[in-house]
Amino acid sequence: MPDHTTFAARHIGPDPQAVAAMLDVIGVGSLDELAAKAVPAGIRDRLSADGIAPGLDRLPPPASETEALAELRGLAEANTVAVSMIGQGYYDTLTPPVLLRNILENPAWYTAYTPYQPEISQGRLEALLNFQTMVADLTGLEIANASMLDEGTAAAEAMTLMHRASRGKSNRLAVDVDVFAQTAAIVATRARPLGIEIVTADLRDGLPDGDFFGVIAQLPGASGAITDWAALVAQAHERGALVALGADLLALTLITPPGEIGADVAFGTTQRFGVPMGFGGPHAGYLAVHANHARQLPGRLVGVSLDADGSPAYRLALQTREQHIRRDKATSNICTAQVLLAVMAAMYASYHGAEGLTAIARRVHGHAEAIAAALGTAVVHDRYFDTVLARVPGRAHEVIAAAKARGINLWRVDDDHVSVACDEATTDEHVAAVLEAFGVAPAEPVASEIATRTSEFLTHPAFTQYRTETAMMRYLRTLADKDIALDRSMIPLGSCTMKLNAAAEMEPITWPEFARQHPFAPASDTPGLRRLIGDLENWLVAITGYDAVSLQPNAGSQGEYAGLLAIHDYHASRGEPHRDICLIPSSAHGTNAASAALAGMRVVVVGCHDNGDVDLDDLRAKVTDHRDRLSTLMITYPSTHGVYEHDIAEICAAVHDAGGQVYVDGANLNALVGLARPGKFGGDVSHLNLHKTFCIPHGGGGPGVGPVAVRSHLAPFLPGHPHAPELPQGHPVSSAPYGSASILPISWAYIRMMGADGLRAASLTAITSANYIARRLDEYFPVLYTGENGMVAHECILDLRPITKATGVTVDDVAKRLADYGFHAPTMSFPVAGTLMVEPTESETLTEVDAFCDAMIAIRGEIDRVGAGEWPVEDNPLRGAPHTAECLVTTDWDHPYSREQAAYPLGKDFRPKVWPPVRRIDGAYGDRNLVCSCPPVEAFA
């Protein structure tokens, strides 16, 4: 175990004495003995004479927090923070300090998880409902989801949504020439394996001949032009096609929104609503539709329902659309998206309100008008919002250089055209410097009136009541107090790795040298960032045993997708494009199957034994049956059942012998770092979750980073980007070349401060805590799966099915009751219905782990009282959970258990009390009566 003065000792919860006590309960004498019993010898890395795991010897020695921050400061200072007037979907913004301090820098917001337990997630669910309302209002459409990964993936999802809605009438999509290049590239990536043909044309001239299922255009366009798309929408509808418009939300405060001209879908980004550019991300994309397409929406959708007392309450709606349930038939492979950034954008809109946003938009447009007036006839377009396209025959390089000399980055379109984008941070001084670069004198602006919007927006009290900093601060505190995040309790969600997000790791993400970088800025502006990215890529290669890494995927789902595309392109490069069969064990997460379907593969399910292991005989039979068409096997390791399968090397060999590739899902890498490397025990490709293993916070449901790591033969097929020729030539999966680059310093700092010994100790401690919980709880809730030596990996599955059969108490009852004890529930009914999957991580102290075990044991005692007939199945502390303060002070308490039993089942001194803000929520009611925007205030009366 690390010395107590190191960062590793601050990150790892149990001290050496606690670890020894846990190992004693498990029945082993040391961490190394535990590793020997849990991790198969055939894949386990052997330590060097210096005690360092192979690969980890390539990491630098651990740094202190002070040293790591000093190194990061040096990398930051190597960057140049120029004035960005590049545009192309990314704009500088002024983040209100009240939002920076109370959301982005607040662990109550950034350490929360996806709101699967809605009763203890009401704060961020309300914030997300505000986001959905904001997007719906601004776009003029009825319903929006709770964020997308970025604008490009939102466009790709818009395409597939329109394709599904058309029910196969056509496989052709029309894309306007003035769509952002990165957006068009991602749409093309998604279209190719799905057999969708893209026709790119200047749609100002109308829809090309032939049948189309959909149309995608931009408002304003990449060139800055504002086009009235009403005629195109009407023409498309006449010919049976749907229309999706990529719309700038700030511009929509002035111009007619997509919904009001008949568009079916709107997509885009909310980045300029207070979220820094961050060298590409993270930012919350958005997707909005008419109500008749609500069930086709991808991703999370927050809806309003009722709780057990009939009060309004928020929850995730229509979850049967999603990948964890529908697998390869899901609407998308997206899990969570960008909740933390969606909250930032929604609160930015609340803070400014409709009037404030409109004033910002008018100021931005005014600066663009000033530039256009001075340029005169050189301006290409008559109608524009923030971006002026100038014709400068043969002078583009000269103008760009002149602006750069004045500290400003412009956008070179080609040798003859330069684009200038204004934003919230643009000043009169910036405008003057731009005019000097063009060599023109200021001129009196001629108003190019673009304000055609007449409809109201953001009229709900959520967008009118919080204009002062005091009001906003208190609103954010009120919302945060309704939730359980890591700042209040462990979150033992299996397969989620809710570990510490250390303050030292988080600090650099708001530094302007990282936060204010445009993703398409000149490379000379970002040497520090590029070195940081290179460091992180090299360290991940060393840790995983692969040969190359791409950091572009901005979610685990996108890492999966990128890895599968690399496999497809590899087979095609060898003259075997017909290889399209993807074998997936029945225990796998639904995202695997959804990603395979998006990559154009056919999913064949491989059975598992009763002990959770892959059925080798069934695997061999499926490999034989599909030998000539076998593309890949997707397998999670350790398995989704929470054990190390001892046959993993044999499984990989069987697939390789048939010409297939092995995709090792890296969701559970926290049980492997420093112990085994997937790139060395048979994997050809893995995605990693930096938001799990490497400490990027979950943010209530995003951001995330899902790098894809590959062996050398797949490296040429890693994601590329139209604006980053230095990357491989694969197909882009994210809008920015390096994805969510501004949060990469978090993982850099974690690895830099932990070092080889600390990383290995983290894995071993996570395994120790999981096995300790398994031992303590097994007699109360049987552990469903263990490995050959009776060990679990970093998580364990508790089987409640026999208990439910005997008593009627369900896994849902136990999950809700845990909130009364002050805990977030483990993962429910995954990967096996009627079970709880518990993952404590290495960061929780023995005191916290014991408190969780004590709560679970007490709950088992309550279950036994139900089973004995002391409490009715329909009226007991579990079925009544969670209990609000309001329900406890009612004068009509007629339950067979006491108020004290409801609120303080282990006494008032057990742990700080968490008061759930609502009772148990009626999910079916919410889906039957779908409401996905802010309800009227009267609903809460």
Curated annotation (Swiss-Prot):
Keywords: Oxidoreductase, Pyridoxal phosphate. GO terms for molecular function: glycine binding; glycine dehydrogenase (decarboxylating) activity; pyridoxal phosphate binding. The gene is gcvP. The glycine cleavage system catalyzes the degradation of glycine. The P protein binds the alpha-amino group of glycine through its pyridoxal phosphate cofactor; CO(2) is released and the remaining methylamine moiety is then transferred to the lipoamide cofactor of the H protein. Its EC number is 1.4.4.2. Pfam families: GcvP2_C, GDC-P. CDD domains: GDC-P (cd00613). SUPFAM superfamilies: PLP-dependent transferases. One of its GO terms (cellular component) is cytosol. Signal peptide: none annotated. The glycine cleavage system is composed of four proteins: P, T, L and H. It comes from the Bacteria. This is Glycine dehydrogenase (decarboxylating). It is an enzyme of class 1 (oxidoreductase). Gene3D superfamilies: Aspartate Aminotransferase, domain 1, Type I PLP-dependent aspartate aminotransferase-like (Major domain).
